[in-house]
């Protein structure tokens, strides 16, 4: 979900980013948490390649290969293998299928829709919930718990009441710097 607002719009490497964790849920249509196995590959710039742990996927002249061990000559500074398995492989396949089915232009549109939907939802909910910040948001909306003041209701109570009414609640208490944070991540393809 952390890539939703920029997928198809920019390349992290062009921003000087050397390492990035990409959540496959939401951005690339894979389940998360209670809805299924989460998955988040970590991508590295070429500059950090020799330090990467294994297993890893490398692009060699347009062919993608799975590197299982760090004994290869270009991985001499790797600290070795992280796990004995390759993560939630089904989620990688699902994400790749999603990307291929949308294509470059489709992914760019998905990104634009994510930002549009988030801002529409923010505007729609702002008379009921308190936005943590003024102005536009990207692909998710952050509210604080000011709307609950003087009610005796806490953020957790509010989220549990949503479950009682048949709604999946938003992420609560994250990020930690926002008191009583309620993080809403609308979908962009439904």
Where do the language-model regions lie?
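Conserved PLP-binding catalytic core of the aspartate aminotransferase-like
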Residues: 130-165, 180-190
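Conserved PLP-enzyme active-site core in the AAT-like
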Residues: 1-65, 77, 152-153, 180
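RecA-like P-loop NTPase motor core of helicase/translocase proteins
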Residues: 18-21, 136, 141, 173
């Amino acid at each position: 979900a952390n890539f939703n607002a920029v997928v198809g719009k920019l390349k992290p490497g062009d921003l000087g980013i050397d390492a990035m964790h990409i959540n496959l849920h939401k951005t690339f249509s894979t389940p998360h948490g209670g809805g299924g196995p989460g998955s988040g590959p970590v991508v590295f710039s070429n500059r950090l390649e020799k330090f990467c742990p294994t297993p890893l996927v490398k692009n060699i002249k347009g062919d993608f290969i799975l590197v299982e061990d760090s004994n290869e000559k270009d991985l001499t500074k790797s600290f070795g293998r992280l796990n004995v398995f390759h993560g939630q492989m089904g989620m990688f396949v699902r994400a790749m299928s999603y990307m291929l089915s949308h294509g470059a232009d489709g992914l760019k549109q998905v990104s634009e829709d994510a930002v549009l939907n988030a801002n529409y939802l923010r505007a729609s909910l702002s008379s009921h919930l308190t936005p943590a910040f003024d102005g536009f948001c990207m692909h998710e909306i952050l509210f604080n718990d000011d709307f609950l003041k003087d009610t005796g209701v806490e953020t957790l109570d509010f989220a549990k009441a949503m479950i009682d009414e048949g709604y999946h609640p938003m992420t609560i208490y994250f990020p930690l710097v926002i008191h009583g944070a309620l993080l809403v991540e609308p979908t962009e393809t439904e």
